[in-house]
């Protein structure tokens, strides 16, 4: 027992000695000072923040432009120190430039030690003062090479290796300060990285990598940067403001963390972005584990950059309409599927059925989605042109191809450079003003970029743009950013270029990416108004992306490692990024820059927001956007908010209507439209023409039945077969509407089964009668049985053809004769029905032969004519129907059946039938030959005796025998005298 207790105590002691804390946290605790005094506490706090010693030794071009404190006597580029008003950039005069003035001033912090950012600012209703950061001395003397240095922040060395060797500088700093993390002073061979990267420090290794196009592309080598983008500066300010707000909120303060940022200037160029990311992750000690997410604010097509982002496997939040799907990618704006649906909804609203599409590599996947949606919605894409490069030659060829098409509306899914070349090509090809209506995604640079501003005066076509709906509080956010932009710690070069581009002036003679091309020199006093500098800027998407990452981070920490001291995102989970991306998708919050609660569509990963469709007009040297309609993202419905037939600036009218009936696409669209509309029996019941035709068919069937009754009571010979023939004509009349009803399972079955049976009921008795007459056989019950057997054989044949045919009753056919749904097997459906009646055709031919052989018989003439009619009927349909269009073919077939029934009904009353030779009194005496009447003249007494004998014959057999004998003697005598029967007594 004592051994067990001792063993239990050892187990408990070993568990207590286990340390589950992270390596960083254990290092912090192990390096704690033994004595507690204020100085040691400050050193310990510095040890917890591994990014305190971030410092950049700027290149020589930055040294000439210190922005630590803007001078109060003149423009900031002319004085070493200066101050600027909060809203109006009009610095007051001060006698002491080194101290902050008493008035409302804002200090512009230069590209300095970011450990002091953001600066402590005390704001009141009228004034605000900013404490100036201290000056840090660089230690460039310890570096042998004369290169630019970057004080980096991570414990890891420069190269991305798991077990790197510590540098000498790291060993030296660890000896000097045992309470801080190792800091590495790494050599940066490229000045470009210093110009392209801005780091906002964090007390932890938690950074958001923001890819923002601070500069535009040069458009030449696709590597160098062009002019600065004032929209990007404003959006970067919104990003920094959102980051500051989320760090100062209780959301992150409660867990003791704050999130930093690494802003990379992509210059809207793929190669430069790749170089910056590569040097950032391999040329500095910034590691992948320091990054928690990526905010991509550059919508430029950058396949190589996207490949690097996929290799990083970080959650990506896009702030634009995403054109390509990727893993762990979401967005605060919808994907391109929603703008495509918006365009289609607007086109359908204005009854446009035909469009053209021009696109480049960026929208290659979106075009396939557009074509699929357009096909389902009944809109034809006449021409889809892939613009492979942004050259003038290619653009001119595209314009020539558009001029050859019928469509007036052109959906232009183009990048910036391609769109510029397209506007030039429209001018060089001298396209008539208002010839096309272009629909494109609205770009913020349309109102700020010099390339666009110079192209709008010569653009004479109509332009429709798609853009997110502006939130209600957007203007208030712009005013707030107007006050905060001068407070940002921006690189001096960025600030000079922003000033120059915003006020269309040049600061000095330095090369600043084309900004010195402005001839006017910048004034010493300027008022900043973002609504005029960047009138179309949208800051909501990037602000919401930052807040979504912050809220998702808190949710992820609470779910995975609650209560832990989080230094990096991988402290609790080995692979945290999949779960963190899921936390971003699950985030749901309310923000003042969104009219509805912010949430992500779980199936797509993007937000569903309302889109605004604008009409763009260049009026008085400015672009004006007038709203045409709003698209609901839930129901994909378009709500028109203005008239689309309003006059433009040049007197033409915008007509959102485009058709191309002669194009191949329209024909294919018609096929798809007809194919989608499956015929049904319900539609046939409501069609007026079909109902009228059916009424005539029923009347024809009733007429045949009435004639059958009259014929049966008036004919003594073969009356049963005659009744069956008339019954077949009635069934034939009823089968006629099946050919005019739209093809469906019921009508097709009636066509294949009822028509052959009806025609067999009509022809089989005629065939049996002709054979019996030819054989001189009288009518009997067996003759009806023979006709019934023939009908049964035809029924079996038709049923087998119906069951052994294709599985579907209908088939969609598109040939020269038309495009429509038809009974299977499609084009040859009527031909197959007539082939199934081959037995009836053979019987009709035999009936014709036998009737011709017994033409002397009284009923042979009508049998002959009915046989000829049946042969002509079947032959004419079999030969002519394949040559008739589909819509006319069914009508011809149904009408011919009714005509055949009516003509056969008339032919059945022709010929020398015995019924026509009988008298109305039952067949006593007919006036056939006057010579016969002269030799047989009876007195009235003899006539009365004859009548009495007739009545007596019905009751007395002996009298009947005498009467028959007398009649036979009279007939024999008349035959010998005149060669014909003089009269005929009725058969008892």
From Swiss-Prot:
This is Uncharacterized protein C30A5.10. Keywords: Glycoprotein, Membrane, Signal, Transmembrane, Transmembrane helix. The keyword Transmembrane helix applies. GO terms for biological process: G protein-coupled glutamate receptor signaling pathway; regulation of synaptic transmission, glutamatergic. The keyword Membrane applies. It is a multi-pass membrane protein. Residues 114-140 have a biased composition (Low complexity). It comes from Caenorhabditis elegans. It holds the Pfam family 7tm_3. It is found in: Membrane. One of its GO terms (cellular component) is plasma membrane. Residues 111-176, 966-988 are annotated as: Disordered. Residues 1-17 form the signal peptide.
